[in-house]
Amino acid sequence: MPYQSIFRPGLFGGQSILVTGGGSGIGRCTAHELAALGARVALVGRKREKLETVQREIAEATGDANTATIHVCDIREEETVKATVAAVLAAHGRIDGLVNNAGGQFPAPLKDISGKGWDAVVRNNLTGCFLMSREVYNQTMAAKGGAIVNMLADIWMGMPGMGHSGASRGGILNFTETAAIEWAPVRINAVAPGLIASSGLDTYDEPFKKSIRERYKQIPAGRYGTESEVSAAIVYLLSPAAAFISGVALRIDGAVPHAKRIWPHTGNGSKSPAFDGFHLASFPEVLRDVAAK
């Protein structure tokens, strides 16, 4: 019998994966990737229209209208999260994996962030991740096992201009490490994207966009990352290939944390080859000129 790689067609066949923030960006890309590998996907988010669009895309791609279900949910609301997880279980019969992708933030220096603004970001990122994880664990994974992947950011040297997001993502990192112990053998991991060319970059104000256009010079890989590269890391951590990996944060950042001032990055004019497999991804307009360089 010929050897069959773990990275094979139908890798997630028979499994059900819940993806929060599944209506756009990395969540949308991850949902497509999982569906292409045989999973049924539960798309969770606040905006029904976005979820319905992704549901149609997946149905067209797979030829099966039942591959993806949609569930409108505000992950910050405890009772709503409980009901949503129960609804996914009723529709799918199981939840084998959870991708806590949903979140959000806005650029602002710490001195200008109001208490309301701080709470909004912490609830969106940290509280939502906790509530969704707890409910999936309590309602199914405690008895049947599974894997959870959380969303971080490049938080290790601070996040000037987004301190509320850095604090909440730091909380998610500690939650990931703690849950990996308390909830074992359920596997709990996280991904930490660095500078990613996501369509969400276009929503920021012009001063922040200007800094975004310059920051690629700090990346040893010579370019921004892609949504596909983040979703590929998420899928890996959900897969049997990562069966002995738990409590870790996988950085997807082109070696930015290791760039040293004593060894300046000259880049010799070259870029690392990108994996940009998601054909429906929207490249941010703010980076069009940068990509052409």
Walk through the language-model features, giving the residues of each.
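C-terminal substrate-recognition "lid" of short-chain dehydrogenase/reductases
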Residues: 93, 130, 223-252, 257
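Substrate-binding pocket helix/loop in short-chain dehydrogenase/reductase
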Residues: 109-110, 114-122, 215
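Short C-terminal tail/terminal secondary-structure segment
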Residues: 2-7, 235, 246-293
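Short, small/polar-rich loop/turn modules that mediate ligand/substrate recognition or access, typified
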Residues: 99, 184-187, 245-247
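Catalytic loop of short-chain dehydrogenase/reductase
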Residues: 149-171, 176-177, 181-184, 195-196, ...
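Alpha-helical segment proximal to the catalytic Tyr-Lys
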Residues: 138, 181-184, 243
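Conserved glycine-rich cofactor-binding loop
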Residues: 16, 23-25
